[in-house]
Amino acid sequence: MKLTHRPLAFLVMGFVWVLLACLIGLALFLGMTAGRPYGQVFRSLHVHGALIGGVMQIIAGLLLAGREHRTSQPTIFMALNLGTLGLLIGQAHGHFPLMSLAAIVLIGAFVPLRGDLVRQIRHSIVGAPMNYWFYGIALVSLAGGLLAGAAVPLRLMPYNLVGQGRLVHIHLLTQGFVVLMIVGAMHTQFPAFFNGRLHSPILGQLTFALLPLGFVVLLAGFLLTNLWVQIAGGVLMLIGALCYSYNIVRTWQDAGRPRKPASDLCLIATLFLVIAITCGILVSVNVLEGQPFVPFGSLHLAAYTHLTFIGFMLLSLLGALTDLLPNLLAEDRTTSNKKRGPYEAALTGIIGRWSTVQLWTLSIGTMSLAVVAALVWQYPLNAWPVKAAALAGALLLLTGLVVFATKLVQLLIEDPDQPSAS
């Protein structure tokens, strides 16, 4: 199949980046539990490959898919992928000029998307002024996160603030931009799975008010190194996440509790968002007295952060891809409306295969990271329960990713001119 630089190419390439980054991440996780941790370079490749090449490229594809006329965008596509590649090569070799150039290219890649972001604001199911506040924080976080990431290799940040700068950089991009964009989009997209309506616009307004407010307070806590301010921000975000989760679940119930692969993924993702924010609050509470109540090391940090990265972000985006890919493929490959309907139905059947296996392997695999971290409190790192749980979790996550990747390949090779076997 020939892929142009339309939204479909962004979505497919974004998942390829996510898959590669996840394979690196699984190797890092198993190495950590085996007592043979890999270096900082591999961790950086994993994080930036997944976040920028993967998640943010998928978000760019989803924004472009919302255009009335889905034209080819080779400049944005090349900037995102070459920028990500340049950033990773620069990090691997410690080449600061290349990293700086890549960061500037990545910033430039999102400039042409400003109109799509504005359209997202205007079409939000939650009206003004909350939609302007919500998406305004998301846009500022995107710009701030990319600029903060560029400031370190450009040496524009004082050396004693580099640690805080990296913390702000990652939180601006993940929680300030990605989490807010997904939550905002789901208020419109999730009801569309069932051709229904959002259960409560009032709860939507509360979510749009509290999530970004909590994030701003949390960010202030990081900058001030004040744990109480961080906890206050986390509590505000948790209340916003609870409003969001309740609204999503009730929307599903109002539609008659249908079982659809896309909605199932997004429902479980809302649960992980609540769990992740709760764990974040507990992380701060754990060190309120200076000495932590329970030990908290790099393995615990990895388990906690991936409740958000895999449990919320990845599952939500896979849900969106499950719903959108058959439509985009049918539109790109067929010119006849008569042929498009049956072809899209065949593609929907393909993407729905093994959906239960995919959902539960990814969900239980994500929770297994937390189980491994908890086991370390009771057993040494080289004990068999820790190793067995780590291996089982890695295999579950790998299985879920391979299932989706296999279905994606089947979608891409499905011929609209041949009768489908599904």
Language-model segments: what does each one mean?
Residues M1-S422:
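Hydrophobic alpha-helical transmembrane segments of multi-pass integral membrane proteins
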